[in-house]
């Protein structure tokens, strides 16, 4: 797995954008929403975080999380959430014609783009700007 440069700050607040694979408008499908809700609850049990804001759009989502003190590992949390959703409803949204060899090799579903965008919230003004955006 590549080692991406990430702005990690224990106890920090982060703004995320996560996009569906090929911008499929599946994020508002009832099965997806339920799988996402369950995945978030399950992940938060093992890896706690606060959800400050969340918006779910047809092909992407935005959210703001605050991590616990002494914890900056949002990547594990996103990995858990994406994995659980894929296991729960991946077959329903599977598109075999989209499975390139690299997606087959990594046993990926056709639900998520591989990466996501994150932004470390720097101060209260930055937090307010991102809350307004959501």
Predicted feature residues:
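Short catalytic/metal-binding and nucleic-acid-binding patches
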Residues: 1-133
């Amino acid at each position: 797995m590549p080692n991406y440069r990430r702005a990690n700050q224990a106890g920090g607040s982060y703004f995320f954008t996560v996009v569906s694979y090929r911008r499929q408008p599946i994020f508002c499908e009832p099965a997806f929403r339920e799988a996402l809700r369950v995945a978030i609850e399950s992940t938060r049990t093992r890896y706690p975080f606060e959800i400050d804001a969340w918006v779910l759009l047809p092909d992407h989502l935005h959210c703001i999380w605050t991590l616990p003190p002494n914890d900056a590992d949002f990547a594990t949390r996103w990995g858990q959430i994406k994995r659980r959703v894929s296991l729960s409803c991946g077959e329903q949204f599977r598109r075999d014609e989209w499975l390139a060899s690299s997606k087959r090799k990594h046993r990926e579903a056709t639900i998520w783009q591989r990466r996501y965008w994150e932004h470390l919230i720097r101060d209260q003004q930055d937090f307010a700007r991102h809350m307004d955006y959501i």
